[in-house]
Amino acid sequence: MERIAEPELMQDWDQARAYALADFSEPHEAFVHHFQRLFPAFAGGRVIDLGCGAADVTIRFARAYPDATLVGVDGAEPMLRLGREAVARAGLESRVVLHRLRLPADALPGEHDAVISNSLLHHLAEPAALWDAVARAGCPGAPVLVMDLLRPTSKDEALALVGRHAAGAPPLLARDFFNSLLAAYRPEEVRQQLDTAGFGHLGVDVVSDRHWLVWGHV
């Protein structure tokens, strides 16, 4: 199935609110656990979350690493507003800061000891923007973990995934999940992107029926 792009930014308040209120605890906790498994020596430092959205992964990462400070960047103001509210509720304002920044960006906030990103790539009109940001945002040798959706082989398979993982979800959220699956990349496409970006040394692993991981060091 060919990729079908979706809008790059989540600017609609109802859409952003539905996303922020949804229960993504399983994949988001899995993201943090994958980082802990792949980078056992990492203990803390400056971390950047590219495409932080409503900051759920950012907050979970901060809780898992008390000695880390995090900068989350995203281009959608509705998501950032909801994310800042979530950071405040979590009592993490001293360690988590969110900025509005749309990739590709001329300036990223400093060099970081780790680079993370969850479910950003499938939103980007030009995927090279993410890999360029990873290269510029991370210190030499910094751990990198990127996770995103895996495009199914057909629309029927995409509908089956929606039924499996979004049963009972609001229709708006189920529709967004379906569209995101259609906009996602296949592992072989990600591998080609990495090779083109000079990141051929990074690994690409399929970790669920709907997710792949890119991991390694800058």
Regions found by a protein language model. Name each.
Residues 124-134:
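A short, conserved alpha-helix within the catalytic core of class I
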Residues 25-44:
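Conserved alpha-helix/loop element of class I SAM-dependent methyltransferases that forms part
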Residues 13-27:
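Class I SAM-dependent methyltransferase Rossmann-like catalytic core
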Residues 105-109:
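Short conserved loop adjoining the S-adenosyl-L-methionine
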Residues 1-17:
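N-terminal, positively charged/glycine-rich alpha-helical extensions of SAM-dependent methyltransferases
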Residues 48, 56-104:
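Class I SAM-dependent methyltransferase SAM/SAH-binding core
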Residues 147-197, 203-205:
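C-terminal alpha-helical "lid/dimerization" subdomain adjacent to the S-adenosyl-L-methionine
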Residues 116:
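A conserved beta-strand element that flanks and buttresses the S-adenosyl-L-methionine
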